[in-house]
A protein has these predicted regions:
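Cofactor-pocket helix-loop regions in the catalytic cores of large enzyme subunits
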Residues: 1-47, 53-55, 91
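Thiamine diphosphate
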Residues: 36-37, 41-229
């Protein structure tokens, strides 16, 4: 639901958009932490209104995929949820959407790096290592103004600082006749509960308590896998 916390989570941002969306709106996301949050929060109300590229974790599919979906569904609003990491890898189809008059609504959830991989590092008993900008060993850390960047490609855009501002911005985006990009800073460590075993290994010979616990959980999950499938 709505929140007044300083940095909202991915789930808060997705929920804000969902509450103000139309049943015919199509949600698109891929890779990173957004897929898990969108799948739990976004409950489709019509057929063919939820596109999640999950299996191959194709970072930067979000905007390009949304463009293709918009071309196939010109009378529907297509909403792309994208993290800052995926956005930086590939974003030029914002320009493509503008010059071909295929309006998209793009929600950039900026959590300061590749936060889901940072989460994986910690869950597997490791320490933070160059996945979040603030914990990286960089001599000149500068932020990216995603709103201005999108505007330079012809999109309308704005930076918002709260969930209530996000909801109002989304209403403006719905009325826009050109691609509309909304950027919001989100929490780097806050995720929804609910997960399943993922066979992503850790150290076989642990050298810290964190590694030891990660190996224990890994083996417990491995023991529950179906054999020969």
């Amino acid at each position: 639901g709505p929140t007044n916390q300083k940095l909202p989570s991915y789930a808060h941002a997705v929920g804000a958009i969902y509450r103000n969306s139309d049943p015919s709106d199509i949600a698109v996301t891929a890779a990173g932490g957004l897929v898990g949050e969108v799948v739990q929060v976004w409950r489709p109300r019509e057929l063919n209104t939820h596109e999640t590229e999950w299996g191959f974790s194709c970072m930067s599919y979000e905007i390009s995929g949304a463009l293709g979906i918009k071309m196939a569904n010109p009378n529907k609003d297509v909403i792309a949820f994208v993290g800052d990491g995926s956005y930086l890898l590939y974003n030029s189809d914002i320009y493509s959407s503008v010059i071909t008059n295929n309006k998209l609504i793009i929600i950039v959830c900026d959590n300061g790096g590749h936060a889901v991989i940072n989460r994986l590092q910690l869950f597997k008993g490791g320490k933070e290592y160059n996945c979040l900008l603030e914990s990286s060993n960089t001599p000149n850390l500068v932020g990216v103004d995603f709103a201005k960047h999108a505007e330079s490609m012809g999109a309308k855009s704005e930076q918002v600082n709260s969930i209530s501002e996000l909801e109002e911005a989304f209403k403006r985006a719905k009325k826009s006749d050109v691609t509309y990009v909304i950027s919001i800073k989100t929490h780097s460590y806050q995720w929804l509960e609910g997960s399943a075993y993922w066979e992503s290994p850790t150290l076989e010979i642990p050298n810290t308590k964190e590694n030891e616990e990660a190996l224990k959980l890994h083996k417990e999950g491995k023991a529950k896998q179906r054999q020969g499938v």
